[in-house]
């Protein structure tokens, strides 16, 4: 079977990179629709406008309405068509970037993204998640290509809430363990076919970077400063994890995250916070070594990620709720079926309870 790997056309990262955005956009197109968070425009609109103007680029800067819905995509497509814009750039959080990618897909033009937080690995992916105008999940929009350009301004990331960086570490934490599991079962990745050795090595390097730099990066972002550790964690959260999950494979950890959405108490937690607990559940499913479990729990605890159900605000009626989580995690088509040998609802239910107990024991010592 053929193997494949995919990634953005170009990845740029550095302090104050947004000031140089126009230079990076210029080779792609000379007329841009800029879609940005209202919050981002509040502190960066002048920087964006000056950067593109200095590069000789025409632009319209529009505020994202807050929901990545088909209605919002259609509105922005109409603006791009009316003004003859030949490329799209999204600046802000995940929904803004997903919207920009979707608009570019329907307009059949290049897309660039500039994430202002490092809370997930989504910016580099060939995927947009669409919701209804009311905020309910609608569908996945699988895109034919990854963004042509990803630009991350680490000075902006450093000023974002520290919890967002921790959530990105939680999302990135799954990359190696899910890629390892998917590789063992020869599961097809989003790139097509089993993982390449390059993708697996990127996934492993992502995990090693989190272990080495995670706690130091959290201290940096708490102080709102850019350090070498923060630079490396931003790259791990955004690029290494982005390429790693898409071309390395996904397995139980993200399926457990999806299962946890069945429990109302978890709805206010970030994606990566729930994924981090999903990693512990996957390791319990795999009967991972005590050393590996301790290593993962130590990292999670150091950066403020949950390792028990109580830390996800699940404290009552646990057996019933975990049964619902296990059933949803094992739904047909879920990525948990990429686990070697397959898994059952009973096995996932047991792993959820064991992971919680392991986390509790860790916190006692």
From Swiss-Prot:
Pathway per the UniProt entry: Polyol metabolism; glycerol fermentation; glycerone phosphate from glycerol (oxidative route): step 1/2
Pfam assignment, any one: Fe-ADH
Binding site for Zn(2+): 171, 254, 271
GO molecular function annotations of the record: glycerol dehydrogenase (NAD+) activity; metal ion binding
GO CC terms of this entry: cytosol
Biological process annotations from GO: anaerobic glycerol catabolic process
Enzyme class: oxidoreductase
InterPro entries attached to this UniProt entry: ADH_Fe/GldA, ADH_Fe_CS, Glycerol_DH
Residues binding NAD(+), per UniProt: 37, 94-95, 116, 119, 125, 127, 131
UniProt name for this protein: Glycerol dehydrogenase
Organism (species): Pseudomonas putida (Arthrobacter siderocapsulatus)
Gene: gldA
């Amino acid at each position: 079977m053929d193997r494949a790997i995919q990634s953005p056309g170009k990845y740029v990262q550095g302090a104050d990179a947004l000031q140089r955005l126009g230079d990076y956009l210029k080779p792609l197109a000379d007329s841009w629709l800029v879609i940005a968070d209202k919050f981002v425009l509040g502190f960066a609109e002048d920087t964006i406008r000056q950067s593109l103007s200095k590069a000789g680029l025409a632009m319209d800067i529009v505020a994202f309405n807050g929901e990545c819905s088909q209605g919002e995509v259609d509105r922005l497509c109409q603006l791009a068509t009316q003004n003859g814009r030949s490329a799209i750039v999204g600046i802000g959080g995940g929904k803004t970037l997903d919207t920009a990618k979707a608009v570019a897909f329907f307009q059949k033009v290049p897309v660039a993204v500039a994430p202002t937080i490092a809370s997930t690995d989504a910016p580099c992916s060939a995927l947009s998640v669409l919701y209804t105008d009311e905020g309910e999940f609608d569908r996945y929009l699988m895109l034919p290509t990854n963004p042509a350009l990803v630009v991350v301004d680490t000075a902006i990331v450093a000023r974002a809430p520290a919890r967002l960086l921790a959530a990105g570490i939680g999302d990135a934490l799954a990359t190696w363990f899910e890629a390892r599991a998917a590789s063992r079962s020869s599961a097809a990745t989003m790139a097509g076919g089993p993982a390449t050795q390059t993708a697996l090595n990127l996934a492993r390097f992502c995990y090693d970077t989190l272990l080495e730099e995670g706690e130091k990066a959290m201290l940096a972002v708490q102080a709102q400063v850019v350090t070498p550790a923060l630079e490396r964690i931003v790259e791990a959260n955004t690029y290494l994890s982005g390429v790693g999950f898409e071309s390395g494979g996904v397995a139980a950890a993200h399926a457990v995250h999806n299962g946890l959405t069945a429990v109302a108490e978890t709805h206010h937690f970030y994606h990566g916070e729930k994924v981090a607990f999903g990693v512990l559940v996957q390791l319990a499913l795999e009967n991972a070594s005590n050393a590996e479990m301790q290593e993962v729990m130590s990292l999670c605890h150091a950066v403020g990620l949950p390792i028990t159900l109580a830390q996800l605000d699940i404290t009552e009626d646990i057996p019933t709720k975990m049964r619902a989580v296990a059933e949803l995690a094992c739904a047909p088509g879920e990525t948990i079926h990429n686990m070697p040998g397959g898994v059952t609802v009973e096995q996932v239910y047991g792993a959820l309870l064991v992971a919680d107990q392991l986390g509790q024991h860790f916190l006692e010592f």
